[in-house]
Amino acid sequence: MYIEENERYIYYYLIFSIWFYILYPFLDIILNNITKYKTINPKHKQQYFISNLVKGTILGLITPHSYFILYNYIFYNIWDLNEIKIMASLYASIDLVSLFQVNKMQTTTIVHHSMVQVFYIISLLCFNFNEHEISTPIVIYAIFSTFAYMVNAYLALRLILNVKYLKLFATISSIIYQFCCTLNWSYQCYYLYLSNINFIVKLIYSIVIMT
């Protein structure tokens, strides 16, 4: 277990989570000044709106940095553990807070957010996010999910946007999402086929990401 060397990243994870948890009611107060937000019904969808707005915004902001992590790994074989661990802490904390802040969340979303926490903890404490472990495809999966930030933005904005703009936003989001999925799944299959990772670990990981 890599507990001692990752102590500060666990603190990052907790600090990010607390910050996002506090952010929800703060945003709710601000957004209640917007008529279209106030009229969102049922009311629990307002938390759904905030959840996707926060996630879409944060993922959008870290997309350029995620791109450089991926670029450096592919072309220069640079696997920057510090950057990866910080980004992973941020990514996981967003989904953790959603589990507590969003009421009546769909079961599939609950499972997804929960598995993000499991993969984060396992990758950090069991594998130390080391290259050539199961952590590698997990990180790449997260990076491509980051690139698809417009999907989360769309899930929020569809509740308040004009239909005219919503169709354009939906089209762009769909194209980006499909493109990211194609590249991501191609890499996942390629890596899992060629890597020397334990077969049972590969099998469990494959089953989880396909559910």
Regions flagged by a language model, labelled:
Residues 1-103, 196-211:
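N-terminal signal-anchor/initial transmembrane insertion module
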Residues 14, 80, 140-143, 173-176:
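Hydrophobic alpha-helical transmembrane segments of multi-pass membrane proteins
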Residues 40-58, 108-119, 164-178:
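Juxtamembrane helix-loop boundaries in multi-pass membrane proteins
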Residues 59-62, 91-98, 116, 120-123, ...:
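Helical transmembrane-bundle signal
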Residues 69, 126-127, 192:
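Hydrophobic alpha-helical segments
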Residues 78-79, 108-112, 136, 167, ...:
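Non-cytosolic membrane-interface motifs at loop->transmembrane helix junctions
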Residues 151-211:
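C-terminal transmembrane module of eukaryotic multi-pass membrane proteins
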